[in-house]
A protein has these predicted regions:
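Substrate-positioning beta->alpha
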Residues: 158-165, 179-202, 209-213
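NAD(P)-dependent short-chain dehydrogenase/reductase
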Residues: 140, 151-185, 229
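Short-chain dehydrogenase/reductase
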Residues: 74-78, 109, 120-132, 152, ...
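N-terminal Rossmann NAD(P)H-binding glycine-rich loop of SDR-like oxidoreductase domains
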Residues: 1-20
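Mid/C-terminal beta-alpha module of Rossmann-like enzyme folds, strongest
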Residues: 7, 195-260, 275, 280-281, ...
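NAD(P)H-binding glycine-rich loop region in Rossmannoid oxidoreductase-like domains
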Residues: 30-91
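Conserved Rossmann-fold NAD(P)-dependent oxidoreductase catalytic core, especially the SDR/UDP-sugar
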Residues: 23, 82-129, 146
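Conserved beta-loop-beta element that borders a ligand/cofactor-binding pocket
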Residues: 100, 132-157
Length: 314
C-alpha cells in the first residue's frame, strides 16, 4: 500500500510495485487518481489515524511517501507520520518511510548512515525527529519500520528544488531557477530509482530497524547537470542563480523562497551519499544515468501543463 500516491515518489512507487507483480492500494486525500489498471484507489488523509487504520487493513507493507508544502511542515508532517504508523501497526504491516538527508546538516565527504544528526535548518531538525520516531516505533516493538533515504530528487511529478523551477522554464524558454553554486558535486537521484530502492527495502526482513542510503550515479556538478538539460531541449538553458542572500530577499514576497533559503547549503558544498551499505546487502540497485533521467523528465514536462513555479515538496 502506498500512502501519498499522488506525488512524484508515490506515483513512481505504485508503478514499481506493479512491475514486481504486487497488489497495490494507492491512498491520497481525494481518492481520485489516474492510476494504472489494477490499482485500488482509496481516499485517506495521513493525519487521520483512524482512517489510516481502515485503509491499511490487509496490507503487508505500507509505504509512507507523504510530503507536504514547506510552509505546512510543522503543522502537518508529525501527524501524518504518526497516522501512517498507526495504520501499519493496526495491520501488523511493515512501514517503509521515504526520507531525505537533511538531518545530517553540513558535512564533508559522502554522507553515511552512521553520521550523527546535526541539522542546521528547522526542516532538518524536523526530519531528524521524524526519523527517530519511526525507528523508535520499531525498537519498541510497536511496528516494523525501515527508512530509505535519497538526496535531492528529480523526475516526473517531483516537486523539489530540481523540479518545476528547473525543468518547466527549460521547456518554455524562461529562466530556470538554480539555488546555490554551479561547481559543487551533487548526487541527484532519479525518482524511479528511489521507488525501486524503497520497494526493495519493503521485501527484506534484513532491512528493518534502520535507515539506508539508496544508490545514485557518480556525483555531478550543477553546471554539468544543466548542460545535459540543455542538450535535451536542444538549446542553452538560461539560468537564474540564487545565492543565500538573494533567496532570503526573495522570500520577503515569496514564501517558497523563504522556506527554501535555509536549505541552500546543500547546493553550496559537496552533497553526496555513500550507499555502500545498501549495495553490499541488497545488490547494485537501480541507478539511472543522468542523461537518461533528464530525458524522461523532459518528456514528462512536455506533456503536462504544470510548468509554473511550484510549492516544493517531494
Amino acid at each position: 500500500m502506498v500512502v501519498g500516491a499522488s506525488g512524484g515518489t508515490g506515483s513512481a512507487l505504485v508503478r514499481e510495485l506493479l512491475r514486481r507483480g504486487r497488489r497495490v492500494r494507492a491512498i491520497n486525500r481525494s481518492g481520485r487518481l489516474n492510476a494504472p489498471p489494477g490499482v485500488e484507489v482509496a481516499a485517506g488523509d495521513a493525519r487521520d489515524a483512524e482512517r489510516m487504520r481502515e485503509v491499511c487493513r490487509g496490507a503487508g507493507v505500507v509505504y509512507n511517501t507523504v510530503n507536504v508544502p514547506f510552509t505546512q511542515w510543522r503543522e502537518s508532517f508529525p501527524a501524518a507520520v504518526d497516522g501512517v504508523l498507526a495504520g501499519a501497526r493496526a495491520a501488523s504491516a511493515t512501514m517503509v518511510f521515504a526520507d531525505d538527508t537533511w538531518m545530517y546538516g553540513r558535512v564533508t565527504g559522502p554522507m553515511t548512515e552512521g553520521l550523527p544528526y546535526r541539522p542546521v535548518s528547522d526542516k532538518g531538525v524536523l526530519r531528524a525527529w521524524l526519523a527517530e520516531r519511526v525507528i523508535a516505533a520499531h525498537s519498541s516493538g510497536q511496528v516494523a519500520t525501515v527508512i530509505g533515504r535519497a538526496p535531492e530528487l528529480y523526475g516526473p511529478a517531483v516537486e523539489s528544488l530540481l523540479g518545476r523551477n528547473l525543468f518547466g522554464p527549460a521547456l518554455t524558454h524562461g529562466p530556470a531557477l538554480w539555488v546555490g553554486e554551479l561547481d559543487q558535486p551533487l548526487g541527484p537521484m532519479f525518482v524511479e530509482d528511489f521507488a525501486h530502492g524503497l520497494a526493495e527495502l519493503g521485501e527484506h526482513e534484513a532491512a528493518l530497524g534502520r535507515a539506508w542510503h539508496l544508490p545514485t550515479p557518480e556525483p555531478i556538478t550543477a553546471q554539468a547537470f544543466l548542460d545535459l538539460l540543455s542538450a535535451q531541449v536542444h538549446r542553452p538553458v538560461r539560468v537564474l542563480r540564487l545565492g543565500e542572500r538573494s533567496a532570503r530577499t526573495l522570500g520577503l514576497v515569496w514564501p517558497v523562497a523563504r522556506e527554501g533559503a535555509e536549505m541552500l547549503y546543500q547546493f553550496s558544498q559537496p552533497h553526496t551519499v555513500d550507499a555502500s551499505a545498501y549495495t553490499t546487502t541488497f545488490g547494485p540497485g537501480q541507478v539511472t544515468p543522468y542523461a537518461q533521467g533528464i530525458a524522461h523528465t523532459v518528456d514528462w514536462y512536455s506533456t503536462t501543463a504544470r510548468r509554473s513555479f511550484l510549492r516544493i515538496g517531494r
